[in-house]
């Protein structure tokens, strides 16, 4: 009250009104009964075992699928190997046949060159004969 005596008005602190509906009450945590804990543990272990069994089964099935895919791939590669061997064998046969035909192909090339040379000679002979004929006709007219 000394402040009031000095001329400063005394302020009174007002507290906010309490709303009892907004206040939560805490309940004491109770330990579940021993039988409930045992039942929950059994249930948890059972469900965990089911889950792990499912996971292991799925993984096992994945590995079986992968093994089957590897076997099929191996068979496909063996088929491709056989095909490649057959192609190689056929190619060797064709190369041998081509080597056997090579002398005849060389002869054909030589004959083709000779025919071209003979054709050129025939054109020259034809041109020469035309010139000769023109000269003969010219001399005949005189």
Curated annotation (Swiss-Prot):
The entry assigns this protein to a family as follows: Belongs to the BLOC1S2 family.
Q: What does this protein do?
A: Component of the BLOC-1 complex, a complex that is required for normal biogenesis of lysosome-related organelles (LRO), such as platelet dense granules and melanosomes. In concert with the AP-3 complex, the BLOC-1 complex is required to target membrane protein cargos into vesicles assembled at cell bodies for delivery into neurites and nerve terminals. The BLOC-1 complex, in association with SNARE proteins, is also proposed to be involved in neurite extension. As part of the BORC complex may play a role in lysosomes movement and localization at the cell periphery.
Residue stretches in coiled coil: 79-127
Task: Give GO MF terms, alphabetically.
Answer: gamma-tubulin binding
Q: In which tissues is it expressed?
A: Widely expressed. Highly expressed in most brain regions, spinal cord, kidney and ovary. In the brain, expressed in the frontal cortex and the superior thalamic radiation, with the strongest expression in the granule cells of hippocampal CA1, CA3 and dentate gyrus regions. In the spinal cord, mainly expressed in the gray matter. Expression level is high in laminae I-II and V-VI small sensory neurons in the dorsal horn, as well as in the large motor neurons of the ventral horn.
Where is this chain compositionally biased, Basic and acidic residues type?
11-33
Region Disordered, annotated ranges:
1-33
Originating species: Rattus norvegicus
Q: What induces it?
A: Overexpressed in injured nerves.
Q: Name one Pfam family in it.
A: BLOC1_2
The UniProt entry lists the main location of this chain as: cytoplasm
Q: PANTHER family attached here? A: BIOGENESIS OF LYSOSOME-RELATED ORGANELLES COMPLEX 1 SUBUNIT 2
Q: Which domain of life is it from?
A: Eukaryota
Q: Name one GO cellular component term.
A: mitochondrion
Q: Give the quaternary structure.
A: Component of the biogenesis of lysosome-related organelles complex 1 (BLOC-1) composed of BLOC1S1, BLOC1S2, BLOC1S3, BLOC1S4, BLOC1S5, BLOC1S6, DTNBP1/BLOC1S7 and SNAPIN/BLOC1S8. Octamer composed of one copy each BLOC1S1, BLOC1S2, BLOC1S3, BLOC1S4, BLOC1S5, BLOC1S6, DTNBP1/BLOC1S7 and SNAPIN/BLOC1S8. Interacts directly with BLOC1S1, BLOC1S3, BLOC1S4, BLOC1S5 and SNAPIN. The BLOC-1 complex associates with the AP-3 protein complex and membrane protein cargos. Component of the BLOC-one-related complex (BORC) which is composed of BLOC1S1, BLOC1S2, BORCS5, BORCS6, BORCS7, BORCS8, KXD1 and SNAPIN.
Q: Where in the cell is it found?
A: Cytoplasm, Cytoskeleton, Microtubule organizing center, Centrosome; Lysosome membrane
Q: Which UniProt keywords apply?
A: Acetylation, Coiled coil, Cytoplasm, Cytoskeleton, Lysosome, Membrane
Query: Per the UniProt entry, what are the Gene Ontology biological process annotations, in alphabetical order?
Result: anterograde axonal transport; anterograde synaptic vesicle transport; endosomal transport; extrinsic apoptotic signaling pathway via death domain receptors; lysosome localization; mitochondrial outer membrane permeabilization; neuron projection development; positive regulation of cell population proliferation
UniProt protein name: Biogenesis of lysosome-related organelles complex-1 subunit 2
Q: Which residues carry this modification: N-acetylalanine?
A: 2
Keyword hit for Thylakoid: no
């Amino acid at each position: 009250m000394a402040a009031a005596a000095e001329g400063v008005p005394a302020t009174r602190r007002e507290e906010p009104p309490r709303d009892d509906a907004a206040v939560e009450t805490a309940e004491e945590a109770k330990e579940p009964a021993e039988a409930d804990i045992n039942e929950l543990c059994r249930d948890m272990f059972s469900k965990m075992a089911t889950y792990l069994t499912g996971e292991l089964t799925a993984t096992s099935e994945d590995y079986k699928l992968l093994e089957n895919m590897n076997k099929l791939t191996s068979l496909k590669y063996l088929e491709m190997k056989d095909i490649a061997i057959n192609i190689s064998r056929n190619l060797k046969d064709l190369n041998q046949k081509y080597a056997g035909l090579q002398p005849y192909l060389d002869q054909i090339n030589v004959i083709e060159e000779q025919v071209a040379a003979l054709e050129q000679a025939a054109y020259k002979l034809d041109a020469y004969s035309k010139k000769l004929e023109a000269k003969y006709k010219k001399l005949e007219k005189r």
